[in-house]
Amino acid sequence: MTMPESMLSESKLSGWAISPKLAQLASLAGHYADPEFSVAHGGHVRTIAAGHYTVSGLSRHVRLGEFVAHRSATGIHLGEVVRVEPDICYVCPIEPGEPIGIHDTVIRKGAFRVSPDESWCGRTINALGEPIDGQGPLASGIVRRSISNNAPPSMTRKRVETPFKTGVRAIDIFSPLCLGQRLGIFAGSGVGKSTLLSMLAKADAFDKVVIALVGERGREVREFIEDTMGDNMSKSVAVVATSDESPMLRKMAPLSAVTIAEHFRDQGDNVLLIIDSVTRFAHAIREVAVASGEPPVARGYPASVFTELPRLLERAGPGAEGTGTITAIVSILVDGDNHNDPIADSTRGILDGHIVLDRSLAEEGRYPPINPLASISRLAKKAWTPDQEKLVSRLKALVHRFEETRDLRLIGGYRPGTDPDLDMAVKQVPIIYETLKQLPDEPAAQDAYADLATALRGGAQNGQPQVNPRMRG
């Protein structure tokens, strides 16, 4: 059908007035063309309780994890289905203090989706994919992605084989990493997890950085984005759910973040995914599960927590051939410095390595307070050369000898010359410890082995023997 010439000329003259209407019509057409919105299944609110409400009439049409919506005078409000029974389903509202009443109409919305786009870099959004940085609306990408996607099939993934430098000497020497690896930073509160994460976020090996700040203090969010990330924010997307937000938003933030990271990975980018912290994600799941009536099974944690943790973390890693990688570095807050609490224990078994931060080292002023003996990278052999592996093994032996004889030396039981290995440990380990010190505002270490070699050679010139002259491998 051809537009009449008179109408065509009129549209050209007043295009500035017609274009917004056409854009609105196109948006509505795309919205209603989605089969999900062709038919709306609805129900009514039956009961309301703290943390959840129940809906009748939807049990046959919804699945666990799907979203529903209801309209109020203040807008449309979302909730997640967390339990389904024959007559009713339980819904946890996304927003705290959501206005809802008995007999309100609730509509099924299906899986929650986001539409990541390249233009999201440099932006800060909430768990729903909405901008919170005051820089205007977000552009929607072509592909709408469910935040509850499954991990890629294991046999379709590339192998993890390419090492990269983090710029943190203690990690690059003792626990080196590879692109596509999943690493956990384990520590108690106030030891320096977020500080170490900020140092790792500055690594040059990544095309994109996606950050999930879960349960963080509100005042720290802007400081982290503006001060810590700085210029690196231009290639980063921050997903934020602060501690005062609802457990549903704190649960959704890491899921939205990994979905955005998957988008960039599928575009061929090497992505760094930072989640701070996985423990608060687990706490949010626990709050939602307990509100739905799920019983706790391990120190107050319901079984669904241990189902959701691997589902989240397994989504990171390498993609299929021709795509990029997601390197996940996540923090785990250990309760009472107990590294065997259920979340820490479960997460340690899922990840490809763990960095342990020691409170006693932080109290001594050694930053980052990484315990090199307790920290492990399961892919270190792919990053070390044979000579580097021998060197690190020797360094760990010296550090272990130094630490296990600390009490003996304090009471005066050490006599130089009686144990050559202990003599070397006493002379060299303090130099090693001093070399590993690194403040967040210091430049990233370009060659950690060269820095260590220089320090040890300086010690040798002062009469101390070298550990190994072949430092670079």
UniProtKB/Swiss-Prot annotation:
GO cellular component: bacterial-type flagellum; cytoplasm; type III protein secretion system complex
Compartment(s) of residence: Cytoplasm
Taxonomic superkingdom: Bacteria
PROSITE patterns: ATPASE_ALPHA_BETA
Biological process according to GO: bacterial-type flagellum organization; protein secretion by the type III secretion system
InterPro entries in the record: AAA+_ATPase (IPR003593), ATPase_a/bsu_AS (IPR020003), ATPase_alpha/beta_chains (IPR050053), ATPase_F1/V1/A1_a/bsu_nucl-bd (IPR000194), ATPase_T3SS_FliI/YscN (IPR005714), FliI_clade3 (IPR022426), P-loop_NTPase (IPR027417), T3SS_ATPase_C (IPR040627)
E.C. number: 7.1.2.2
Binding residues annotated for ATP, in chain numbering: A187, G188, S189, G190, V191, G192, K193, S194
Keywords attached to this entry: ATP synthesis, ATP-binding, Bacterial flagellum biogenesis, Bacterial flagellum protein export, Cytoplasm, Hydrogen ion transport, Ion transport, Nucleotide-binding, Protein transport, Translocase, Transport
Catalytic activity: ATP + H2O + 4 H(+)(in) = ADP + phosphate + 5 H(+)(out)
Keyword Nucleotide-binding: yes
Gene Ontology molecular function: ATP binding; ATP hydrolysis activity; proton-transporting ATP synthase activity, rotational mechanism
Family indicated by similarity: Belongs to the ATPase alpha/beta chains family.
Role played: Probable catalytic subunit of a protein translocase for flagellum-specific export, or a proton translocase involved in local circuits at the flagellum.
PANTHER family recorded: ATP SYNTHASE, SPI-1 TYPE 3 SECRETION SYSTEM ATPASE
Name by which UniProt lists this protein: Flagellum-specific ATP synthase
